[in-house]
Amino acid sequence: MSSSRPVFRSRWLPYLLVAPQLVITVIFFIWPAGEALWYSLQSVDPFGFSSQFVGLENFVALFHDSYYLDAFWTTIKFSALVTFSGLLVSLFFAALVDYVVRGSRFYQTLMLLPYAVAPAVAAVLWIFLFNPGRGLITHFLGEFGYDWNHAQNSGQAMFLVVFASVWKQISYNFLFFFAALQSIPRSLVEAAAIDGAGPIRRFFRLSLPLIAPVSFFLLVVNLVYAFFDTFPVIDAATAGGPVQATTTLIYKIYCEGFTGLDLSASAAQSVVLMFLVIILTVVQFRYVESKVRYQ
């Protein structure tokens, strides 16, 4: 039986090929993570010139801080809303475009447009539309007697940042979902249709199980996106307000480190966030991926 394992003429060539990625990983991932862990155990002055080892005092103070605990639960709620809303909406549009025969190319282009917009620009766009005084959407809502002011209403502020974050991520999710649906053999779809399965039943019984690997991949990607890459949206749209209603962990790390100049607390919070994401990712790979069947 022949082996498909590649054979290199030089024993050092595989290491040479891996070296650039290894260097990037060490410089931009492992080293900063190690620095954050070290600073989290220190009491550092605002300019970082002097430090004193304090052990776990920063973490103890962290979990006795009511504002941090509020940000923690806000992050869990915000990430769940962004992740699952983004996946469901993207999958819905991908299924619709996959079902459409005429004009599908136009709809594909339309769905990919948000991907070209920077997160901060996306937030500003929706701020204009939801502006309490002159926004087009708020004017429309006012016609139905609904007052909108996300600067004063915490629920509306959360809706705005979730909506803008989901809108920004739709294109990425749509691209993978649509490609996965297009890769399903047409013969299977036609056979299911001949057996009497309607479009909805074909989707849930045939298409959805076949795209499970892609769905799992997007679940992990969207979770990381919600934890880290939504910072520009929150900063531009609400700045964490009102009354810290939209302050997530990543935004609180920024406020502590760059606004409050408390490097030790900021480092401790970043370490907690790092381990939280690692735990959630491991749980997903352990329990969610076990339900996925790769073919």
Curated annotation (Swiss-Prot):
| GO biological process terms, semicolon-separated | transmembrane transport
How this chain sits in the membrane, per its record, is:
Multi-pass membrane protein
Q: Which UniProt keywords apply?
A: Cell inner membrane, Cell membrane, Membrane, Transmembrane, Transmembrane helix, Transport
One GO cellular component this record assigns the protein to is: plasma membrane
PROSITE patterns hit by this protein: ABC_TM1
Name the InterPro entries on file.
MetI-like, MetI-like_sf, UgpAE/MalFG_permease
The record's annotation in Pfam families points to:
BPD_transp_1 (PF00528)
Q: Does the keyword Transmembrane apply?
A: yes
The record lists the membrane-crossing segments as: 12-32, 81-101, 110-130, 158-178, 208-228, 263-283
Q: Which Gene3D superfamilies match?
A: MetI-like
- Principal cellular location given in the protein's record: membrane
- Any ranges marked Cytoplasmic in the topology annotation, and which? 1-11, 102-109, 179-207, 284-295
Q: How does it assemble?
A: The complex is composed of two ATP-binding proteins (UgpC), two transmembrane proteins (UgpA and UgpE) and a solute-binding protein (UgpB).
Write down the NCBIfam families for this protein, in alphabetical order.
PRK10561.1
The UniProt entry's sequence similarity note says: Belongs to the binding-protein-dependent transport system permease family. UgpAE subfamily.
The protein, known as: sn-glycerol-3-phosphate transport system permease protein UgpA
Q: Which organism is it from?
A: Salmonella typhi
